[in-house]
Amino acid sequence: MKPKFDGYAAQYDAWFMENENLFQSELRLFQKVLGDIQGKRVLSVGCGSGLFESMIDCSGIEGIEPSHDMGAIAQKRGVNVIAFGAIEDADLEENAYDVIYLNGSSSYMEDLTRAFNVCKKALKPNGKFISLDVPKESAFGFMYLLAKEAGTFDHPSLSGVMPKLPYPLEL
């Protein structure tokens, strides 16, 4: 099965660049919750193209990404992609990571409970687990679910429904 984002890596980054104010808002939130990661072992689950990681010092950040297209870009940006595949199927070292985060990737996981259990096992005692995502109960989350069912955001039935500014502009 072809990963969901293969063939869409360029569009993913382009969307954030076209919506720079939204990108900057999300980036500030990302930086705030991530905190100081110097000297820590960090894993990005669903690292995508490494766009957010490239805006911070991503040296040392490891990543797991189902899409080879996205992961290849992440590697070029400095993320050490340790696996191409779903977190649910990953065989991670126990108690290995100080920080594990999911930045917008949990809504694409087939088995969220299993994914979180894999992360829990790999997290060091007193480690930090971060999940940044759009709640499925929110208006934008509902749009994601509709687009997922339709197979695209470009489906005619979703025309004119997407909000222009889906994220908060200020944190």
Give the label of every model feature segment:
Residues G48-D89:
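Class I SAM-dependent methyltransferase SAM/SAH-binding core
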Residues Y101:
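A conserved beta-strand element that flanks and buttresses the S-adenosyl-L-methionine
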Residues G104-S105:
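Short catalytic micro-motifs in class I SAM-dependent methyltransferases
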